[in-house]
Amino acid sequence: MGIECVGEVEKTTSSNLKKGQKIVSIMGEMGRAFDGSYAEYVLLPNEQVYPVNTSLSWEELATVPETYYTAFGSMGNLQIKENDNILVRVGSSGVGIAFLKLVKAKFPNIRIVASIRKKDIEKRNKILSLGYDEVIFDNNNILETEENFDKILELIGPVSIKDSFSHIKEYRIICATGLLGGKWFLEDFDPTRDIKNNAYLTTFYSGNVSEEKINSMLNYIEKYKIDVKTEKIFSLDEIVEAHKYLDSSSGFGKVIVINK
């Protein structure tokens, strides 16, 4: 497994890459069609190796793809304005937290609300400490609020998308990005009935990637001095522990694995 990695070029057949070049790679069937990034050396197709120019440390850079890339793309597709009222469904997720940091860095006074799926007061307080303005609860994929929003980042997926449409304002946007609800498809979906009239549905897929887009994101992070430090760091021989942590109730945000 391992669908993302950062590192330096050790050897290549590409004239566009040089030994020692700092690179990022995400998606492209890594960890599926061929071995992924859980290794000291990773063999990748040239076309999915993206050279980057950044002053971020290795720990910081490792935190960025694919989480920040997904959040950055979603932010662009949501066409964020400084007076927007935004909802992030599953605000404690890695993408949700990255999205919060990216948006708040540019619009510090914008209102961003997080939803969480368990009534966990400790997690609620931790989320608020990150900079969310309010936390609401998802009760079996139904939001426990009557509030409507200008923009919704939908990270749960098909199991909650119809409920999200009941909370979007007229002429505003939902970006369906995540599948944290564990369901990949939406059955019995009629766009003319299920998409709220005069509202918009878009999406972002992290497989839509290029060197230019990766570096645009990194430039944004450095321009706005965004703190991308991760929640927790594991070494390569602690991958099992890393997955156990993510699966536990204490799992929060994104963790990274470093080859020490």
Per-segment meaning from a language model:
Residues N16-L17, I80, I168:
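Short, well-ordered loop/turn sites that connect or cap secondary structure elements
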Residues V24, I152-L153, C175:
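N-terminal Rossmann-like NAD(P) cofactor-binding module of classical short-chain dehydrogenase/reductase
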Residues I26-V90:
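NAD(P)H dinucleotide-binding glycine-rich loop of Rossmann-like/cofactor-binding domains
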Residues A62-N140:
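Mid-domain Rossmann-like dinucleotide-binding core that forms the NAD(H)/NADP(H) cofactor-binding site
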Residues G73, V209-K260:
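C-terminal hydrophobic helical "lid"/dimerization subdomain
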Residues E122-K123, V159-K223, N259-K260:
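Glycine-rich phosphate-binding loop and adjacent beta-alpha segment
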Residues E144-I152:
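A short acidic, Gly/Pro-enriched loop at the edge of an enzyme's catalytic core
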